[in-house]
Design a protein with these regions (language model features):
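Expand to "…catalyze enediolate/carbanion chemistry for C-C bond making/breaking, isomerization
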Residues: 1-118
């Protein structure tokens, strides 16, 4: 969530869900384990770890992953940092998101390499 509008949306989602007493689910980790390339596999798993750590730290109550091989990784990160079944106490009253925050475009040039790397 390094883009301003994506981070704003995630913070607003947590705030809105918790104000209404519902679970705030994080996004899907699109990476999958890579069997035949240990270096690429560790890079992919590192991205998943960082993403799930950010989600639970921000206040998400759960998450989902694209591959069953990532369930234990994601579950371990959430279980280690949550004291119960949800984080409704994390109200995110500090968050003030405006329409401009949600509509702020990303800077940079659209490239083929960026498309494939996203």
């Amino acid at each position: 969530m390094s883009k301003h509008f994506l981070n704003s949306y995630a913070q607003l989602l947590i705030q809105t869900c918790h104000q209404r007493g519902v679970l705030a689910m994080g996004g899907m980790a699109a990476q999958i384990p890579i069997k035949d390339d240990p270096a690429a596999n560790e890079l992919a798993l590192g991205r998943v770890r960082a993403d799930k750590l950010r989600e639970v730290t921000d206040g998400h109550d759960g998450t989902w992953v694209a591959h069953p091989g990532l369930i234990e990784l994601a579950r371990g990160i959430f279980d280690a940092r949550m004291s119960g079944p949800h984080q409704h106490a994390v109200r995110r009253d500090d968050v003030e998101v405006t329409a401009a925050d949600l509509l702020k475009p990303s800077l940079g040039t659209i490239t083929t390499a960026g498309f494939y790397g996203n």
